[in-house]
């Protein structure tokens, strides 16, 4: 996925993104809890607003986001390709020499990025920096839970890779390659990790024909 501004709205895009995300939330719910409450969005808005939310909205739990984009890559493309050309790795992860653009990686890798302000680009960071960011940002929220942000970052990495692997395997049976994707995670008051925002949509993933 990359940042591009289209000249006009995409008809029914909200419905598409919601349907795709809901599909993956349901299919991958055994891996990590997610934000969905199961509440019908039409039940929490005024009657004259129901048409606006129908098929394009969810009612989500209030969760505290981790301050990272949890990117998983299965192929060398995009900013990962640029990093590989310059350093021979991606986000500090060494990779085999001689890989071509769009080559499949030996195994999926977790390459976190910062959560940039609106209008700015996310910046790839090392896993160690991602852990430091999570430790600092979540310290007060995790006080008294026995958990810390660095460990939750590691938990998010493991969950993200497993989510990607299962999704990619299923997509392959439908003639689709998921080259890479971006997940976001949040925590509840007990410090339990949840998958939030969207999941494996065209806005957060690269889909290629197999």
Language-model features, listed with the residues they occupy:
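Residues forming anionic-ligand binding surfaces in small-molecule and nucleic-acid pockets
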Residues: 1-4, 101-147
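Phosphate-binding core of ATP-grasp and ATP-grasp-like enzymes
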Residues: 106-121, 161-177, 199-204
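A long amphipathic alpha-helix within ATP-dependent nucleotide-binding catalytic cores
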Residues: 140-179
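Catalytic activation segment of kinase domains across protein kinase-like and atypical kinase folds
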Residues: 183-210
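Active-site acidic catalytic loop and adjacent metal/ATP-binding pocket
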Residues: 72, 174-191
């Amino acid at each position: 996925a990359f940042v591009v501004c289209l000249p006009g709205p995409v008809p029914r895009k909200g419905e598409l993104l919601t349907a795709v995300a809901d599909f993956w939330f349901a299919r991958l719910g055994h891996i990590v809890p997610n934000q969905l409450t199961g509440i019908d969005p039409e039940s929490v808005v005024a009657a004259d607003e129901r048409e606006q939310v129908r098929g394009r909205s969810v009612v989500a739990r209030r969760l505290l986001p981790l301050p990272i984009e949890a990117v998983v890559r299965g192929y060398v493309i995009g900013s990962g390709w640029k990093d590989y050309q310059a350093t021979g790795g991606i986000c500090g992860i060494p990779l085999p020499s001689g890989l071509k653009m769009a080559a499949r990686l030996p195994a999926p890798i977790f390459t976190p990025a910062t959560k940039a302000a609106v209008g700015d680009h996310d910046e790839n960071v090392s896993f160690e920096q991602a852990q430091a960011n999570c430790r600092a940002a979540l310290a007060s929220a995790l006080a008294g839970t026995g958990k810390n942000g660095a460990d939750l970052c590691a938990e998010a990495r493991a969950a993200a890779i497993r989510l990607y692997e299962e999704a990619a395997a299923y997509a392959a049976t439908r003639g689709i390659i998921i080259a890479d994707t971006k997940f976001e995670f949040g925590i509840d008051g007990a410090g339990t990790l949840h998958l939030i925002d969207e999941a494996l949509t065209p806005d957060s993933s690269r889909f290629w024909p197999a």
